[in-house]
Design a protein with these regions (language model features):
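Beta-lactam-recognizing serine transpeptidase/beta-lactamase-like catalytic domain environment
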Residues: 2-7, 81, 210-222, 269-333, ...
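Periplasmic/cell-envelope proteins involved in peptidoglycan metabolism and beta-lactam response
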Residues: 1-302, 318, 327, 402-412, ...
Length: 629
């Protein structure tokens, strides 16, 4: 047998080449192995959670169970806002029997008042596993759908429990409560201001599904129970609120008020708001329906984009709480502030005398009293009774612009009141001392040329009569746990001392004189001592030169102040625009009912003989007017 030929020896370069090849191969294997190891480590250590969640997402379907918002109660326990159960209907077309799609569309369209053709089109999309049928239906509708599906063997229809906000009292306190949107989030009023407090924690139901998205047996479900939000107990008393709303409703209709009316009732010693109304109101259960007949008629007369814009404006107008959000010229009611400031600063006493002739000239501008009335020589008390512009121009001049502006700020008229409602203006419109000349000081002294909020005016008058303390207005007395126990209580807050207690006492005497002898006689209440002040202010920024705001503020009992009522009728069209004639009777009606309801006993009335300087046939014509710029 022949011997095999010997293998030729490799040369040195060949051996080096093969060695390098083996080394490269080994390195490549190491790199690949390291890459796989790194990928595995990444998946195990870092991406595991993501893949787990993705797998669960394919295996589980989560359904949110909305939590109820907290309830809102009046101070006397009337339920004002609460959630009620409802049901949202959805369908999974891929789970519905194909041979029953037409039957399902026909039956559900009839029950839910939907278009049958559109419903059948939805059901025919076999790739869909979720489509909305009807949002938030009542129990009887949900029961009819359930019975129909069970009787006809129709699967794939889901009836999910839901929750919706409701207001059992309808229009009652609407501008204060506000309303919520379709997601149960606050849009306005207390619902918006306390949205985080009222909002609960949603629950969830996890349902297992198979690879095709079909729901498995209910034994695979797990549930996280929703938690109800915290509730609110208001300072508002439902009875006093009814007194105010009823009186305002009548006044608005009787005097043809064009730009809505405002009413506020407060506890003068704590700042608690006992009632607040902007009239006409709206129903927060249907907030997008225009309830003012004139506004609705104006909107309906338009078409297209003009109608849409007008509708939006009308809705925003009716939602706005005028008592808090609007600024206005306070008119002669503001004379209480000028008078209190001048007395407190020592610029005048209640017996200081001033002369009122046909008119008074200030830096070339002539001012006169309403109807060009001449009051002659009178004390400060009589000037307040007569609502005399000329006298208050002189009082303002004695006080001086620096002191006037200081007291204006001290009474809280240059800053928000801090009331717990949204949309309060950040500042009012006013003159600072460096921009105030003699004419501006003159007009500001009797209540024109400045614009403040109704809430600011009410809080300031509370300070005038309660001993001089400026209290922060508030509407929520308690935040409640879902079981009704108190989670947080609101204590009254005194912002500062504005005037001396003795000044406040003098002002109470003078305000009572206004009701007994002056332009506030229509605010008198048998058996109760009342103090007040009227106002009839020009709307200087209105295109209508005759536009007026008729207002009156009253406090009772004036010898032991407890309740304040401010009523303002914006643009009344009646036999007069005088606040002492139109608004004072509203205040009297509301306060009398409130005093009786609160158990304040009637007392023997003091003598009410006419003031020596005033006779019944010579009542002051309340109003504010001037000539010139």
């Amino acid at each position: 047998m022949p011997k095999p030929e010997p293998r030729p020896l490799r040369t040195l370069p060949e051996r080096a080449f093969h060695a390098r090849a083996r080394l490269v191969a080994a390195l490549m294997c190491c790199v690949c192995f390291a890459g796989l190891a790194a990928r595995l480590a990444y998946l195990q250590l870092f991406a595991g959670g993501w893949y787990t969640n993705r797998a669960l997402g394919q295996q589980l379907r989560d359904t949110v169970v909305p939590a109820d918002r907290g309830r809102i109660y009046s101070d006397d326990g009337v339920l004002l806002a609460a959630n009620s159960s409802c049901w949202t209907l959805r369908a999974s077309p891929r789970e519905m029997p194909e041979e029953k799609l037409s039957l399902a569309a026909q039956g559900l369209a009839e029950i839910l008042e939907l278009d049958e053709a559109k419903l059948l089109e939805k059901f025919s999309d076999r790739t869909s596993n979720d489509c909305l049928l009807r949002y938030r239906v009542e129990r009887d509708t949900a029961d009819r759908v359930r019975d129909f599906c069970e009787e006809n063997g129709i699967t794939g229809i889901r009836i999910n429990q839901d929750s919706k906000r409701g207001y059992p009292e309808g229009e009652f306190l609407a501008s204060v409560l506000g309303f919520t949107n379709v997601d149960n989030a606050g849009v306005s009023g207390l619902e918006l201001k306390y949205n985080d407090v009222l909002t609960g924690q949603n629950g969830v139901v996890l349902t297992a599904v198979n690879a095709w998205g079909y729901t498995l047996e209910q034994s695979y479900e797990t549930e996280k129970v929703p938690l109800e939000g915290s509730g609110l107990r208001l300072t508002v008393d439902a009875n006093i609120q009814h007194y105010l709303e009823n009186a305002l409703d009548y006044a608005v209709k009787e005097h043809h008020v064009a730009a809505r009316a405002v009413g506020i009732v407060m506890d003068v010693n704590t700042g608690a708001v006992l009632a607040m109304s902007t009239t006409p109101a709206y129903d927060p259960n249907q907030p997008r329906v225009i309830y003012d007949a004139a506004a609705r008629k104006a909107v309906d007369a338009l078409t297209g984009s003009e109608r849409a814009a007008a509708l939006q404006l009308a809705q925003q107008t009716q939602w706005r709480n005028k008592a808090v959000s609007d600024l206005y010229e306070p008119g002669s009611v503001f004379k209480l502030i000028t008078c209190a400031a001048a007395l407190d600063a020592g610029a005048v006493s209640k017996n200081s005398t001033f002369y009122c002739g046909e008119s008074i000239s200030v830096a070339g501008t002539r001012f006169h009293c309403a109807n060009h009335k001449r009051h002659g020589s009178q004390t400060v008390t009589q000037a307040l009774e007569n609502s005399c512009n000329q006298s208050f121009i002189q009082i303002g001049a004695r006080l001086g612009k620096e002191a006037f502006c200081d007291y204006f700020a001290a009474f809280g008229l240059r800053e928000p009141t801090g009331v717990d409602l949204p949309a309060e203006p950040k500042k009012s419109l006013y003159y600072t001392a460096d921009r105030m000349g003699p004419v501006e000081l003159a007009s500001c002294a009797f209540g024109q040329s400045s614009k403040i909020s109704y809430m600011e005016m009410a809080a300031a008058v509370c300070a005038v009569v309660n001993g001089g303390r400026l209290m922060q207005p508030y509407l929520v007395s308690d935040i409640l746990n879902p079981d009704g126990s108190i989670l947080q209580h609101t204590e009254p807050v005194c912002r500062r001392q504005v005037i001396k207690p003795e000044t406040s006492e003098t002002m109470r005497e003078m305000m009572e004189a206004v009701v007994l002898y002056g332009g506030g006689r229509n605010a008198r209440i048998q058996g109760y001592r009342v103090g007040g002040k009227s106002g009839t202010s020009q709307k200087l920024d209105s295109a209508d030169e005759k536009a007026r705001i008729a207002s009156f503020v009253a406090v009772a009992p004036i010898d032991d102040p407890q309740f304040l009522c401010l009523v303002c009728l914006d643009e009344p069209h009646s036999w007069t625009t005088a606040g002492g004639s139109l608004s004072a009777p509203v205040c009297a009606e509301v306060l009398e009912q409130t005093l009786v309801y609160k158990g304040v006993p009637r007392a023997v009335e003091p003598e009410t003989d006419p003031d020596p300087a005033q006779t019944a046939a010579d009542l002051p014509a309340d109003g504010d007017s001037f000539d010139g710029a």
